[in-house]
């Protein structure tokens, strides 16, 4: 008797499955369409044998280009390692590698644009075309405006840390390629306040992503909705059918081991093609300020990303000095 397909196999028929990791071996094993890299993952890569040659090469570059401006050298090595890891990952996946712009640029439109262009140029030097890369940017007003310009230049963007409808709609209106609403972090906020949902259908993160997905489809938006930051397979299963789902290796493994039925939960609705009303900076700020959860989680998310980047830079500094 033929075994029934795993839930991971069934999910792949409903949504594009993305690996929320830069773990080379996990990506080889789990075969996602897309994957990601960020400072935390690059820092972990410093200890993985598969990246040893890349790391030694870039550290040697850093030692040779030390000069007087040590911080600039450290930052450049961090960029080179990020793109180097991304280049290796691009050879494993048929789709895209998301590459994160420095979180400390989250409120600087022009600096975000400059860093994105730099990453794309660095990838090109390594033989990776821009259609293999998504530039990951925090969904502040300034980040969304940077993405608007980058999209016009043909550089596709992944706007991350989406917690609020105005963030999502502003991204769609700006023509952003993809948004990443954070399911688990939304749930975390309410659970911390003693508001644990009675069922998965009442999970505030699941409800939010379903709402954004339905509105985008109804309005005919081409912006891809990629659910992110999952705390359980139940959250993932509740969003089966979403455009894309980015999932950690441990949850991918659990889905792969489960051979139960996985029904579709999200489907494109009949579009009424009602245009998304442009959102200006004032209404965006007002909406965000009125949403305690989004305000807290966007700020803490940026802060966490910035601390991760600083930890990577410190590790590089230590290795350059060693």
UniProtKB/Swiss-Prot annotation:
Pathway(s) served: Carbohydrate degradation; pentose phosphate pathway; D-glyceraldehyde 3-phosphate and beta-D-fructose 6-phosphate from D-ribose 5-phosphate and D-xylulose 5-phosphate (non-oxidative stage): step 2/3
Subcellular localization(s) per the UniProt record: Cytoplasm
GO terms under biological process: carbohydrate metabolic process; pentose-phosphate shunt, non-oxidative branch
Entry keyword set: Cytoplasm, Pentose shunt, Schiff base, Transferase
EC number of the protein: 2.2.1.2
Catalysed reaction, written as an equation: D-sedoheptulose 7-phosphate + D-glyceraldehyde 3-phosphate = D-erythrose 4-phosphate + beta-D-fructose 6-phosphate
Leading EC class: transferase
A single cellular component GO annotation: cytosol
Active site: 136 (schiff-base intermediate with substrate)
CDD domains with a match to the protein in the record: Transaldolase_TalAB (cd00957)
Example of a GO MF term: transaldolase activity
Functional description taken from the UniProt entry: Transaldolase is important for the balance of metabolites in the pentose-phosphate pathway.
Subunit note: Homodimer.
Family as reported in the entry's similarity comment: Belongs to the transaldolase family. Type 1 subfamily.
Name recorded for this polypeptide: Transaldolase
């Amino acid at each position: 008797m033929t075994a029934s397909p795993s839930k991971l196999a069934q999910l792949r028929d409903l949504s594009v499955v993305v690996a929320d990791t830069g773990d080379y071996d996990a990506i080889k094993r789990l075969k996602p369409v897309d994957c990601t890299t960020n400072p935390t993952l690059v820092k972990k890569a410093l200890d993985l044998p598969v990246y040893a040659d890349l790391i030694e090469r870039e550290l040697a570059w850093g030692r040779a280009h030390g000069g007087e401006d040590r911080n600039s050298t450290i930052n450049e090595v961090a960029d080179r390692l990020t793109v180097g890891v991304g280049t290796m990952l691009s050879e494993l996946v048929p789709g895209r590698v998301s590459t994160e712009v420095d979180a400390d640029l989250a409120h600087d439109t022009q600096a975000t644009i400059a860093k994105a262009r730099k990453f794309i140029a660095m990838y090109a030097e390594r033989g990776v075309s821009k259609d293999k890369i998504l530039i990951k940017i925090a969904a502040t007003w300034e980040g969304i405006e940077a993405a608007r310009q980058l999209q016009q230049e043909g550089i596709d963007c992944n706007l991350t840390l989406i917690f609020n409808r105005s963030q999502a709609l502003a991204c769609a209106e700006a023509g952003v390629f993809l948004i990443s609403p954070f399911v688990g972090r939304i749930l975390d906020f309410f659970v911390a306040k003693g508001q644990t949902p009675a069922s998965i259908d009442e999970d505030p993160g699941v409800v939010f992503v379903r709402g954004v997905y339905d509105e985008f489809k109804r309005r005919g938006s081409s912006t891809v909705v990629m659910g992110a930051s999952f705390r359980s397979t139940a959250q993932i299963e509740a969003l089966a059918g979403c455009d894309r789902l980015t999932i950690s290796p441990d949850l991918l493994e659990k889905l792969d081991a489960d051979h139960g039925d996985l029904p579709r939960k999200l489907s494109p609705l009949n579009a009424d093609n009602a245009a998304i009303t442009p959102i200006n900076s004032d209404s965006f700020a007002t909406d965000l300020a009125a949403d305690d959860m989004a305000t807290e989680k966007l700020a803490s998310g940026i802060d966490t990303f910035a601390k991760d980047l600083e930890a990577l830079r410190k590790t590089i500094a230590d290795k350059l000095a060693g």
